[in-house]
Amino acid sequence: MRHLIRSSRYALLAVVLACGQSDGPDISDNFQWLESMHGDSAMAWVQTENARTATVLEADPRYASIYKAALDMAQAEDRLPYVSFLGGELYNFWQDSAHVRGIWRRTTLASYRSASPAWTTVLDIDSLARAENANWVWQGSDCARPGERRCLLMLSDGGEDANTVREFDVVSRTFVTDGFVLPKGKQRLAWVSLDTILVSREWEAGEVTTSGYPFIVKRLARGQALADAVEIYRGSATDGGYGVSPATLVDAKGNRATFIDRPLSTFESEKHLVRATDVAQLSIPRKAGIVDMVDGRVLVQLSAEWTGGAAPIPAGAVAVFDLAAALREPGTLVPEVVFAPGPRESVAGVSATRDRLLLSIYQNVRGTVLVASRAADGTWTRTPLPLPENVSTGVIDTDITGNQALVSVTGFLTPSSVWLADASAATAAEIKTMAPRFDATRSVVEQREATSKDGTKVPYFIVHPQGMVRDGSNPTILYAYGGFEASMTPRYDADIGKLWLEQGGVYVMANIRGGGEFGPAWHEAGLKTKRQVIYDDFAAVAEDLIATEVTSPRRLGIQGGSNGGLLMGVQFTQRPDLWNAVDIQVPLLDMLRFEQIQAGASWVGEYGSVSVPEERAFLASISPYHNLRAGTKYPEPLIWTTTKDDRVGPQHARKFAAKMSAMGLPYLFHEVIEGGHGAGANAAQQAHTTALEFTYFARQLMDPEKQFVP
């Protein structure tokens, strides 16, 4: 079969080369056979490519040491255990060398604050997988409030987004005998009561949207067969986004509300309130999200202006509406503003405690957390928690039975830590810090700005050695994402620190348009046919690094995944002169067929659609797969993906690599067989992928004699 694949590849060579010589994009597609995720021919091609890449990267004298360091850090016993409040205790999911798939465990707050917490195992996924001969990967839990004793556990086959759901009792630590069980699927669920849940899933074959997500919500009672579940809401098969989803909010006073979110596009959705006898649509902007509830007031995070209150509430703000009023008059909500960010601010998240709100705010890409409380006249006061400055901060979890919250603090050179906050007093204290993984004293962090092609100032962080000589010789990795209003903020990354910074490398994170660093407007500036500004921003940062002699094209590498993988592909084809290494992670690359591959149709709101002529023309102009040129001098990229990725899919990466092969262009390709939309299903697989990446960067950007120093 391998010979058949090789023969077909070379038979297509002349066609590919001929098409690749035109000035415009090459819209031919001779590698659709690689779109079969698990097809025999496709998998044989994958195995051949994996073996070829292994002979290059794993044979490098640096690889073994890099892999060992990555695995040791991934499985270290003194890693920081992040926890969440559940039933009066703290729960954590943990993986190490003895628990490859992981254990779900718990401890008390007092014990967690000690140097050596006493953990009780609630569920051992390794033991469960062995007993059931299943390839289980933990995907989380949803526990019924109040009490939080009964939980719906999500278990995935190999890391896919699709999962199996089973009810579990955390007190007895057993699956519930008459519990809820939902077979494998992309599904959404919400507790209505201890004996009733709402479920959105593919009830009958084909009852999914174009993107493969559910659009029908049914009520399922304990002991009731799936076939007998009662439909309460139906969207449409033509809906965009990520599927119709139910969600239940409960506050400390016992107020309870179940909502249904119906996505119409990637960023727009209708919000509905489940009432005793019907499901009523709420008068909330389509670009907004219901996020929590406190004291009978429902929190909404806005990406569009909301009118209807005393004054218009701007996009990017946080607002509330009264639940009791919504139950009476869902179509005439009167919102109150809680917080409206300034021009260089954004809201990263909102959480409720018993009677306070915690707002995660970024000011010029620096984090802080504000405690908000409501006065009797409806005004809100905000007090910052006393947290470190010039770092990233965020709320990990809150306890609605009290005013406690767990807050994360992290920075490029600041080991991640957990802080315990008291929202009623607006105080916070560090209670757990991860052990340093690299010598941060050798490095320094700067925040700088580049000027994009249209004059926009684009901030970026640069982490470099103390006393760095600006002579263009510094090996540099530039990272960005640039899409979906996702913010890239400073964080302590042990792999980057140990495997790159300690080895003398420079790391750069760019806050380009398309992200959410400065609110919805920063994101919307790069939507659909306006997307070229995202790529111009990234190139501007690279050119600034070169102009200031931090690095040079010979020493500059770039990295990005998923939508960031598309960014990498565009930079690879538009500006091959700027880079000597391009790490393309789980990417989108065929932008003329992305709507037909996996969940791609759900992202039309971000990228546009080939069904719209203007948008198709733009997509063709940027699509990396269609803009490869035979005879062009490209750097050798590392392209990697995963077989089990049922979100973006491995098809984009496979086809891009195959086309490069047919054109006689140098490349390295690796496909992880498990792991979903990520680097692997367990620590060993993830460490292997990480080692391949940093070995690749060392080969491309550092001198051959430069050895890895553990």
Language-model regions, residue ranges each:
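Active-site-proximal cap/loop segments of hydrolase catalytic domains
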Residues: 496, 502, 509-710
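Asp-box/WD-like beta-propeller blade repeats and closely related beta-sheet repeat scaffolds
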Residues: 118-140, 150-155, 159-196, 200-211, ...
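Beta-propeller blade signature
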Residues: 105-109, 166-171, 213-224, 271-276, ...
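Cap/lid segment of the alpha/beta-hydrolase catalytic domain
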Residues: 126-147, 155-162, 171-179, 388, ...
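N-terminal Sec signal peptide cleavage junction
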Residues: 19-21
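Polar, glycine-rich mid-to-C-terminal structural blocks
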Residues: 214-262
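Non-catalytic accessory segments flanking enzyme active sites
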Residues: 44-143, 154, 242-303, 308, ...
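Blade-edge beta-strand/turn elements of extracellular beta-propeller
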Residues: 119, 170-182, 224-238, 274-284, ...
